[in-house]
Structures are given as structure tokens and as C-alpha cells.
Amino acid sequence: MTPDGRITSEFDDTAIIEPEEDDELADLELVVLDLAGTTVIDDGLVERAFARAADAAGLTATEEDRAGVVDYVRRTMGQSKASVFRGLTGDDDQAQHANAVFESAYAELVASDGVRAVPGTEDLIRLLRDAGVAVALTTGFSRATLDLVIDALGWADLADVTLSAEEAGRGRPYPDLPLTALLRTGTTAVDGVVVVGDTASDIASGIAAGAGLVVGVLTGAHDERTLLDAGADAVVDSVADLAELLGFHDEDDDFADDEDGDDDFDEFDDEDSLDDDVDSEDDSALASVEGPGGR
């Protein structure tokens, strides 16, 4: 990846900007953003809370046990925390107890250490919503923990929808979170959905939901290779780079619709708009971003 945040990998073809290509994606309607590691800086809080919960559940009697728990937690990062504990314990009651300890420990860590947004997150969300694009914040945390983080950041009115795994039905890697966000926001087609996250589970969830674009970010748990191997259409340094990837231009700090009625999200414009003169000053420099297999 280059210093300016452009994608550099063997999958670069998935993010080439080609205004002349036929656009197979619908108009952009919804961006689904993960919470910890994607829009919120984790600072190791999740892993520390998991360690406390694992100790309380008796899962770390030896150093070998502890290493195994840490490895499992890292591999399953992004999934519902309750389901992770079920995988570790194999017992529902023990998993529920461990999850309760985790939620309590995470709340204590947020209170003592604070929580910070990934730089550029708030600007991105406001930009999207000003352009008429709905935004959902989703998480594997419980609703109580989600609300704690949202309140700590002052984000009560930032996004259109906030969703926990328990409210959607199943957590990642299942498609329930993106699809529930689609229903809650009145989004009309999965092709018009972009899913963004820092873990392989986020990517798998977006793919399972049939999202038009699935993007990985490098501010959280998993690296570029892991995200691409999981099927990400593109990987960027952080959510701050998402606007450029999606075709926004900020020359005049004005992201209103073009005079001809086409919006600045030309990646998701219909075929007719792509046939317009792409050299016009009023048109954005958007790209048709297609993933492997033409999804």
C-alpha cells in the first residue's frame, strides 16, 4: 500500500478506477461500518476484557491454555462475543457467564482508559449522510456495551442506525447485521450496500449479505493479506480513505449533487450516467469497483 493510502496488492484490479466500464453496482444507499477496530480505536481493550473473562471462566489454568485462548480470540475477532465464548467453552451456561464478565470488564476499561474514534470517522459519516447515503454502525458487542461506547464518543445522533449482533439475530460471519441494517434503513437493494470492517469475519458477513462492495481497513485486528484472503474487494488504510475509494472529491468542500442530477457517488450511478461525458468538470472521478468474480 502506498503512502497516500492507495491499494497495492496482487488484487489491485479489483479497485481500478475505470469510468468507461459498465457499472454493475446499484446506486449507493447504505454503508455498514463495524465499530471496534474500524471506527473506534481498540487499543487492546477487547483482548484485555477477553483475558479477564477467560480467567473467570477457568479457561486459562496454564500458559498453554492462555495462549490458545488468545489465538482463538484473535482469529474470531469481529464475531459475536457470546458465540466466541460458546466456541471456547462448549457450554452455554459457562459461555453466558464469561460473556457477562467480558461486558463488565470492557465497560470498566472504557471508563478507566477512555475510548477514541478512528480519525476521519465522524467526517466520513457526515459526508455520507449529507449525500443521502444511510450509515449503520454494527458490532459484536451487546446493546449495553454498544450504547456505552456510543455515549462515550457522543455519537448518539451520528449514524442512522446502530446494531448489536443480538438485535440482528446472529453475529458475524453471518449476513444478519448488514441485512438488518438494510431493512432498518429502508435500503432497496443489497447491491447498493457497502460493508466495511477490520476483520475476516466482517468481510465474510458482507459477502454473505451480497453487498455490492466489501472493504477491509487496517486499523484493527487483521492485516491486508488476511482481509484479501477473506474476499475483500479492496483494502484501505482506514475509514478516512473510504470517501476517495467511493469516488468523492473534495475540491470545493461541496459534495452536493451535480447540476445534471447525478450525485458525487458516481461509482453507484446507473449505466446512463456512466455514459455521460466523464471529462466534465461537474462529474466525479469515480471508479467502478468490482470484486473478484464480478460481485
Predicted regions and their residues:
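Alpha-helical scaffold segments in soluble metabolic enzymes
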Residues: 52, 87, 127, 180, ...
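A generic secondary-structure micro-motif detector
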Residues: 40, 71, 114, 136-139, ...
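N-terminal helical cap/lid subdomain that shapes the substrate entry/recognition surface
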Residues: 11-13, 18, 24-122, 126
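Asp-based, Mg2+/Mn2+-dependent phosphohydrolase catalytic module
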Residues: 1-29, 143, 147-295
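Substrate-recognition element of Asp-dependent hydrolases with the DxDx(T/V) motif
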Residues: 50, 121-153
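Anion (oxyanion) recognition and catalysis
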Residues: 55, 129, 207
